[in-house]
């Protein structure tokens, strides 16, 4: 199995020390990841360091170098209690809203990126949550790809190509054919966590590839049975995570 990486929550006011540490790691091994850029961050949880004016120029330079960029929502603010079509979480910036509301949010995010010199047709939903209305609005705005879903090959659904993430990290390291994504949230990463990623990449370097390799693979239509299975897996994984957090709160 070929493995690529994606980094969520990329903003001008992110944890720059962690980001730059991961940047050096990916540059060292040449496995350029996908970056999920929040066009207009209003989520205080993502605000770690003072915003850097050079952020947008930095993103342009990384894109020119071979890193892949995506639009990570618009504001990264959860305003509904819906899990949508891929319910890893029970909250969303998009799922459950009308077409007009979602189109306006997505169009606003797209314009903010374009105004800063960044063009992408790849969408990354905050919290992994979206619905069929999100996909319809994305398609109307010219987006072609979504980074989400479970699987080991790209697939087509509702006219959009999905580039899957790993259901469980341990399943990504198998002898099966295909390609999947490991998700990284770099803010507040520890030295130990960074070291673990370095060891992971070094031990599997023959299977670690740039995210852009996804675009070389053929995408096939997702069967309804696979869609149902994916929904059940996402709901179960999300529920287990929420129950785990609840247990810790009452421990």
Predicted regions span which residues?
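Active-site beta->alpha N-cap acidic-glycine motif
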Residues: 1-65
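Hydrophobic faces of well-ordered beta-strands that scaffold small-molecule active sites
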Residues: 3-7, 33-35, 69-72, 120-123, ...
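Active-site beta-loop-alpha junctions enriched in small/polar residues
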Residues: 10, 38-42, 74-76, 150-151, ...
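Alpha-helical scaffolding within the catalytic cores
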Residues: 18-22, 51-60, 151-172
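Generic structural signal for well-ordered alpha-helices
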Residues: 19-23, 56-60, 106-110, 135, ...
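C-terminal domain-boundary segment and adjacent tail
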Residues: 30-37, 188-251
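Short, flexible, mixed-charge acidic loops at enzyme active sites
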Residues: 77-89
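Catalytic domains of cell-wall/extracellular-matrix polysaccharide-remodeling enzymes
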Residues: 93-164, 190, 194-195
């Amino acid at each position: 199995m070929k493995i690529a990486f994606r980094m969520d929550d990329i903003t001008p006011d992110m944890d720059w020390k962690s980001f730059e540490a991961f940047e050096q790691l990916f540059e060292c091994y040449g496995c350029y990841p996908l970056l999920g850029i929040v066009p207009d961050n209003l989520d205080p949880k993502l605000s770690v360091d003072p915003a850097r004016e050079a952020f947008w120029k930095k993103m342009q330079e990384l894109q020119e170098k071979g890193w892949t960029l995506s639009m990570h929502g618009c504001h990264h603010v959860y305003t509904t209690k819906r899990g949508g079509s891929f319910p890893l979480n029970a909250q969303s910036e998009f799922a459950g809203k009308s077409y007009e509301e979602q189109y306006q949010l997505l169009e606003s995010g797209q314009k903010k990126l374009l105004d800063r010199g960044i063009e992408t047709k790849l969408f990354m939903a905050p919290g992994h949550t979206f619905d069929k209305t999100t996909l319809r609005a994305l398609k109307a705005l010219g987006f072609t790809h979504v980074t989400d879903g479970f699987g080991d090959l790209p697939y087509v659904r509702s006219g959009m190509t999905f580039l899957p993430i790993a259901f469980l990290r341990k399943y990504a390291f198998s002898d099966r054919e295909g390609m999947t994504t490991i998700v990284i949230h770099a803010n507040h990463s520890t030295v130990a966590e960074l070291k673990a990623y370095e060891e992971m990449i070094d031990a599997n370097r023959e299977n670690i590839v740039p995210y852009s390799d996804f675009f070389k693979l053929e995408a096939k239509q997702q069967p309804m049975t696979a869609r149902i299975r994916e929904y059940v897996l996402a709901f179960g994984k999300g529920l287990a995570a929420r129950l785990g957090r609840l247990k810790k709160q009452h421990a």
